[in-house]
C-alpha cells in the first residue's frame, strides 16, 4: 500500500461512517453517568462493525453476479453513499435529522440507522475494502470515535450547520474518492 492509498482509505472510512455525527449529537448530558457517556459511542461503533459484516456477508452471496462489472459496482455504490450523505446533510440543515432518545430500543434503532451507509457499501466490499480484512475493525473504530467526539456536544443553531457541513463534506469527498477509484490507480 502506498501512502496515498492509506490516506484515501482513512478518508474513505471517515466519510463512510460520518452519518454517526448527525445521529449522536446531544445524546449525552453533562449530568449523565460516566458509563452512559462511553456506552453510547461503543454502541455506535459496534453497530458500524456489525452492519459492515452483514453487508459483506450479503455481498459474498451475490458477488459472483457482478464479477465482470465489479469496479463499476464499487463506483456506483460509492455514489449511492455520497448521494445519501448529501441528502442527509440537507435534512440536518432543515433540522429534521437531530434526535433525542428516551429508551434503549430507540438507541438501538438509531445506531442501526447510522450504520446503514456502511451496510450499503459493505455489499461491494468484496471487490474493494480499504485495508483488506482490517476494514471492519477500521469502520468500528471510526464509528466509535465519531460518536465519542459528538455525543457531548449540545444542540445549538451553529452546531446544526457544522453537523450539516461534516456530512456535506463527506459526500463531496466520497464522490472524489469514487472518481479516483474508477479513473486512477491510486486506490
What does each model-identified segment do?
Residues 85-114:
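Alpha-helical multi-pass membrane helix bundles of inner-membrane/thylakoid proteins
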Residues 1-7, 57-69, 125-135, 182-187:
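Helix-coil boundary and interhelical linker segments in multi-pass alpha-helical membrane proteins
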